[in-house]
């Protein structure tokens, strides 16, 4: 055969250095020569045929412009500036998944968890300046004596966390406000089904990939790109960043648990009309509750708990003595709750109210005042009534233990609202209930709910004076009464049922010893557990998780400043051990844009023959020096997104008044109300003050009108 001597391997090839092939230059292709037009020839047609029809030729008309371009001349001096810094969008401590980090970013926490699992952050020109004061960013150009500004864009870079995933979403569409549905829409289970979201997986979820995720965001929608005054532009919202922690590895349940359902406790129906903690109502409710328990079918079995003896018997201060064993040879002859029987000593029940009276009298002079019916030992909401630690689980207390499956909650028929604790009943009323969320699953409705209520009422201690009430037909048993469809149920924590603080501490501070009642403060763990049972929710298995971001804002400063040049004698300059090693280099001098008013800044046109004119000197003398001194921080974070509700959220001052105020405070209020009539001099001073305020308002109105006519007005700022 011819092929048996054929070599089946390739011969060794010699590699030679070749000269790099020169790439020809791209030449523009010339237009081909235009052919000569064919001469027109007349031809005779048959006379008996139909004449040929021609389509009329449409001539192209010049269209009218739909818009024109407006051009604005730049100022004499322009400086392009980048503001680069790092900002923690989310710091989520253990057990804070349900909270909004931006609301709690300025908290001073000692032993509790810090932060929250979601955030709604708004950025404007004030935020970079505040971060510059905190030494968390740097500016490439100074804005001193440059009172104009143009905004271009911003670039965010997110850094991946080792174990926790995050979801980020931007908003450039005005109005930049929050509504009652903002929190539910930011739950990971709902956010995963939305568009234009940015997933930031952890290194455990995606071991490979980029370390950073960059995103560029342009100016806001409906934004006009022209020069603005920095003083007017510093409060204009540029964008809002919404982010939340999530779990992309185990979206429907943690591998460390064997059940996706959660269970919690709610007050029984016996509390329907006895939930008010007002001073004139709590005493009547306490007596009615004790009598109703005694006449109920449960009877004395309500006291069949592990906490009864602890709360009804004082601790002994005597030392234990050795005694002889007196165990009888025969047992089980008598009924005893210690053996799981339903009978409890009737003497204990009769002494219940007496013990509450003694507890109040002995400690009323040595502790903060409150209400004796709300004490933590024998009050209306003590562990004797509400704890699930029963000696015999067959005989429950005056509570309902509820189980909720997040996979079966459709949301139709659900209702969650906020009401004040002095409210008499648990019935929904539009005038006495606020921030209603309905037809939304419970795990989504509770996401950031309490923090939104705090922003609405502008009260950080709102959770201690209000409670969250719900209606849900998707629990077992159903938290819905067909006979009373608008009556809700008050849930509470297991720590509250066992007379413990929300963090599990058994020591009760003096402030809460006679103010022990279910409120939003004692519903924190319930809200957090309900939020974590939803799909893609962060389980809070880490002590702390942080979403670190890097921002790069692009601005252009403009103005017409005076040329300043400072020259020093080089022979008298200070020296150092090493040339150039003068410690920390001084940063660029930055001025607060809020106080960069064009009226209090020198410009080139203020110079007259080398001197400042009298009008410029008079204008500068009117400058206030209050802004030069440091002040305390703002009451609310600069990055907080305002609420979309207009007007005051509190209809009256009586609803915000604490219900446990004693008679001394009432007498003080009555004395304050009974004031003497003002003298004529005081009335004139009051009228003069009002006229000055009116004059300032009119001047501000005409100033804004002038800016609007000159097209220098800024977009409306949400308050």
From Swiss-Prot:
GO cellular component: T=1 icosahedral viral capsid
Subcellular location: Virion
Keyword DNA-binding: no
Major place of residence: virion
Biased composition regions of type Acidic residues, renumbered to the chain: 664-674
Keywords, sorted A to Z: Capsid protein, T=1 icosahedral capsid protein, Virion
Pfam family, one: TT_ORF1
Region annotation (Disordered) ranges: 647-678
Function per UniProt: Self assemble to form an icosahedral capsid.
Protein name (database record): Capsid protein
């Amino acid at each position: 055969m011819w092929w048996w001597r054929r070599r089946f391997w390739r011969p060794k090839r010699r590699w030679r250095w070749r000269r790099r092939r020169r790439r020809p230059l791209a030449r523009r292709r010339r237009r081909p020569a235009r052919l000569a037009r064919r001469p027109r020839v007349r031809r005779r047609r048959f006379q008996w045929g139909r004449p040929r029809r021609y389509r009329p030729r449409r001539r192209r008309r010049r269209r009218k412009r739909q818009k024109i371009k407006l051009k604005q001349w730049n100022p004499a001096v322009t400086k392009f500036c980048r503001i680069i810094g790092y900002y923690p969008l989310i710091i989520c401590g253990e057990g804070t998944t349900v909270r909004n980090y931006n609301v709690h970013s300025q908290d001073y926490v000692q032993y509790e968890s810090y932060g929250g699992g979601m955030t709604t952050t708004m950025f404007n020109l004030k935020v970079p300046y505040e971060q510059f004061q905190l030494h968390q960013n740097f500016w490439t150009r100074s804005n001193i004596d440059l009172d104009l500004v143009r905004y271009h864009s911003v670039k965010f870079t997110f850094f991946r966390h080792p174990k926790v995933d995050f979801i980020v979403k931007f908003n450039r569409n005005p109005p930049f406000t929050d509504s009652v549905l903002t929190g539910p829409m930011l739950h990971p289970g709902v956010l995963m089904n939305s568009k234009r979201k940015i997933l930031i997986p952890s290194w455990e979820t995606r071991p490979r990939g980029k370390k950073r995720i960059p995103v560029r965001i342009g100016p806001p929608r409906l934004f006009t790109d022209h020069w603005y005054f920095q003083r007017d532009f510093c409060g204009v919202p540029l964008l809002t960043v919404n982010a939340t922690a999530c779990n992309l590895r185990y979206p429907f349940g943690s591998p460390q648990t064997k059940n996706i359902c959660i269970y919690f406790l709610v007050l029984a129906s016996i509390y329907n009309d006895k939930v008010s903690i007002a001073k004139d109502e709590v005493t009547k409710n306490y007596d009615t509750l004790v009598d109703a328990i005694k006449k109920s079918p449960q009877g004395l079995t309500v006291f069949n708990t592990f906490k009864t003896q602890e709360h009804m018997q004082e601790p002994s201060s005597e030392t234990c003595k050795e005694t002889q064993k007196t165990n009888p040879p025969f047992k089980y002859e008598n009924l005893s709750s210690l053996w799981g029987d339903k009978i409890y000593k009737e003497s204990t029940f009769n002494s219940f109210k007496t013990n509450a009276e003694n507890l109040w009298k002995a400690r009323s002079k040595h502790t903060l005042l409150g209400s004796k019916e709300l004490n933590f030992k024998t009050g209306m909401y003590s562990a004797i009534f509400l704890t699930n630690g029963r000696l015999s689980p067959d005989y429950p207390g005056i509570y309902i233990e509820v189980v909720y499956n997040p996979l079966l909650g459709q949301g139709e028929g659900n209702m969650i609202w906020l009401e004040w604790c002095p409210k008499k009943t648990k019935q929904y009323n539009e005038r006495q209930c606020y921030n209603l969320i309905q037809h939304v699953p419970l795990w989504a409705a509770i996401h950031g709910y309490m923090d939104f209520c705090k922003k609405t009422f502008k009260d950080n201690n709102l959770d201690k004076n209000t409670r969250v009430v719900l209606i849900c037909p998707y629990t077992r048993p159903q938290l819905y009464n067909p006979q009373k469809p608008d009556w809700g149920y008050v849930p509470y924590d297991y720590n509250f049922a066992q007379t413990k603080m929300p963090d599990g501490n058994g020591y009760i501070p003096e402030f809460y010893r006679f103010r022990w009642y279910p409120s939003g403060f004692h519903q924190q763990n319930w809200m957090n557990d309900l939020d974590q049972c939803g799909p893609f929710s962060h389980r809070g298995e880490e002590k702390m998780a942080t979403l670190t971001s890097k921002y790069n804002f692009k601005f252009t400063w403009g103005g017409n400043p005076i040329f300043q040049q400072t020259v020093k004698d080089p022979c008298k300059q200070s020296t150092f051990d090493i040339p150039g090693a003068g410690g920390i280099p001084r940063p660029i001098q930055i001025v607060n844009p809020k106080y960069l008013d064009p009226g209090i800044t020198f410009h080139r046109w203020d110079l007259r023959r080398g001197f400042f004119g009298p009008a410029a000197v008079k204008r500068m003398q009117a400058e206030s020096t209050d802004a030069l001194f440091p002040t305390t921080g703002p009451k609310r974070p600069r990055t907080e997104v305002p609420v979309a509700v207009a007007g005051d959220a509190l209809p009256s001052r009586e609803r915000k008044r604490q219900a446990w105020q004693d008679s001394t405070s009432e007498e003080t209020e009555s004395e304050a109300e009974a004031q003497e009539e003002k003298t004529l001099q005081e009335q004139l001073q009051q009228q003069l003050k009002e006229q000055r305020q009116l004059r300032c308002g009119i001047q501000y109105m005409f100033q804004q009108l002038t800016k609007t006519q000159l097209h220098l007005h800024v977009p409306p700022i949400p308050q």
